[in-house]
Amino acid sequence: MSTTDTIVAQATPPGRGGVGILRVSGRAASEVAHAVLGKLPKPRYADYLPFKDVDGSTLDQGIALYFPGPNSFTGEDVLELQGHGGPVILDLLLKRILALPGLRIARPGEFSERAFLNDKLDLAQAEAIADLIDASSEQAARSAVNSLQGAFSARIHQLVEALTHLRIYVEAAIDFPDEEIDFLSDGKIEGQLNGVMADLEQVRTEARQGSLLREGMKVVIAGRPNAGKSSLLNALAGREAAIVTDIAGTTRDVLREHIHINGMPLHIIDTAGLREANDEVERIGIERAWNEIEQADRVLFMVDGTTTDATEPAAIWPEFMARLPATLPITVVRNKADITGETLGLTEVNGHSLIRLSARTGEGIDLLRDHLKQSMGFTSNTEGGFLARRRHLQALETAARHLIQGHEQLVSAYAGELLAEELRLAQQSLSEITGEFSSDDLLGRIFSSFCIGK
């Protein structure tokens, strides 16, 4: 579809409400105003007017706002009609506007896409709009606002600017090799490069926090039947989310709960007890359990403390450990401490975390919550922080890798040309975050995930 078309969409959620808003953006916005309102409202002033049908009858009455480009959200002429929020009324008004020449329904995210294409905001800021709408906690919402206001973009621009200056210095050393001073070996370039690498690592740390706020942590509770997995889910969720009985195999499917630990979203997944299945339904549940385990950020390996004294996962259940991905973090949860009399607490055993608790009484649950938060490196104090997406983390990781490779070329061989190329690639990766260097395919995937009307 053409980006020169005039687009229209409902900007408020579907359904009934006190107010319903239609947004129009494009060169024909003023013509829509004349057709529906009978005049062009004074720019940036609220005007209370009737909204007219083609035969002159009144469809609704409400507030009209006109923002001529480039001083608008999209950078184009924008008209907003704020009427009553009944779906029938809004549908009639939408049909009236679409009947005008040159108008079409906006694609999901197309208003934000046009704002990006018209340099009203960069790609990270555009993504922050969707993140603000989807925020699941106050902390996530505040961080999304910071991103929308350019906090994340400013950090990226600082890195790009530093790389630009460094590239200029390196290129000068390459272009003027006969100068008396060997710029590549005098220590200045390495010092500047080390500074950029340190700054990038700080941004990566903050971005990981922002990603946790947005994406959350996926924790899977796994173990044998009747180990107390569902009781642990209920204890973490603070409600009776799962049925708990003494009958082994009560949980036959995957159960999901979404909670927050001091602002960090946590996706808890309770799974069917792992054993040889007795029937087809249980077999399917166990296979789903393994699928969830393989995609987890951390596994809580639930152990009935009354059945074994072992604390090493391989000693408790070697077959289970053999099937787990080698890099998947595990916390062994020895349950039923209220029965065994074990001392509550968290320890490290041969590289694995071990916690003793009672899911039934709730003793030790706060220790587990703190452990989960700390295991992901999450800090509650993110004042001035920003949200980050997985693609942002990947771009930052790629940039860091190129800088490391460039540093190796510098200190081992004083290879200026190779260093310059690594700096260019690092700069390119960072520019993908703000959209200064992005493929059309990437932009399409990002904006298609937005709401219609945004």
UniProtKB/Swiss-Prot annotation:
For GTP, which residues are the binding ones?
A: 226-231, 245-251, 270-273, 335-338, 358-360
Q: Name one GO cellular component term.
A: cytosol
Q: Name one GO molecular function term.
A: GTP binding
Q: Which residues bind (6S)-5-formyl-5,6,7,8-tetrahydrofolate?
A: 23, 80, 120, 454
| EC number of this enzyme | 3.6.-.-
**TrmE-type G domain boundaries:** 216-377
Q: Where in the cell is it found?
A: Cytoplasm
Which residues does the record give as K(+) binding sites? 226, 245, 247, 250
Self-association state and partner proteins as the record states: Homodimer. Heterotetramer of two MnmE and two MnmG subunits.
This chain belongs to which protein, by name? tRNA modification GTPase MnmE
